[in-house]
C-alpha cells in the first residue's frame, strides 16, 4: 500500500516536492488555501517597474495529475497523532507530512507601520500592495524616500538592496534624482549583512548618492509627522516610506506546541529539515528555522533533499543559497554560499542580470522538475568552497 504524504502549502518548495515524489510509492496530497500560485519575486518589478505579466498561475496546472489538490486552509497539525485538520473541519491522516506553510507579514508588530503600509504599499505582501507602491512612486515629484527593513528576518535578503537601487534608477530616468534624498536604513552594521557581498554593494550605493544608515532598529513610525524612530532614538523623516514589514509563521496550531519558535517558525534540523522531535514531519521553505536565506532556491533544494529522504535515500541540504540581486541599469549579481562556505564576492555584470531574467521565464516549468538535470549541473559548477 502506498504511503501517504501530506504537503501543507502550495509554494515553490511544496510544489517541487509534490512533483518529485514517486507516485508509484506515495499517495501525495497537497493542502493549500489559495487556488493560485504566485511567483513572489515578481512583486519587486510590479512595485518598481509596473511590470505585472505572468505573476500567478492556477496551482492545478503546476502539479502532476496524480497529486491530489485540496483548497482548504490548514488550522491544526497534530504531530503525535499524525493528523492535519483544516478550516472546513476535514481531518487528514498521514505517514509523512511536509510543512511548506510559508510566512506572513505582521506590520502590526511595529506601531504605525500598518497605517503607513496601508497608505504607501510595500513589495513583500501582495500584488495589490506592490501596485499601491508603484502608484506612489509614479506620482512622486521629489523629497525624501526612506527604504529599509523593519526587522532582521525577511524574505529574500537581497531585496532591500534591489529596492533602493531600482528606486534610484527610476528617479534618474525621470530626471528626479537631484530632487530626491534617498535613505537606506538597516538593522545590520553594513548595507549588506554578508561582508564579502557588502564590499560589492556598499560602494555602488555610495557612488549613487544613497545615504546608508546602519544599526537602525525600527521602534515606531509616526504617520502624522512622517518620522521613523529607531530603538536608539534616531529619526528619519520621510516623504515616501518603503518599509519591509516583520514576518511571522503561518496561523497554524501545532501539537506539541514547542515545535515552533516565538515567531511561529517551525523548528527543523538544518540538514534534514525534520521537525524537532519527529521522524515523519519535515519543514521546508520560509516557514522553517533553518539558518539559510528565506528564498526560492533554498526551498527548492530543501524540497529535493526531503523527497530523497522520504524515499529512503541518503540526502542532506547544505544551506546552499543562490539569490539573484538586481543592481539596476541592466546589471546583476548573485549571493552564493552554504552553511560551511562564506558568501562569495561576485561583482555585477550584464550576464548575471540576464540570468535572473531567464530564470523568471523558466520558473513555471522548473516547478514540474523538467529542468532539474540542468539545475543539478549548474549548482555543482557554482558550488562555493569553504
Question: Each predicted region: which residue ranges?
Answer:
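C-terminal auxiliary extensions adjacent to catalytic cores
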Residues: 334-386
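FAD-binding core/adjacent interface of flavoenzyme oxidoreductases
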Residues: 2-3, 67-162, 166-175, 242
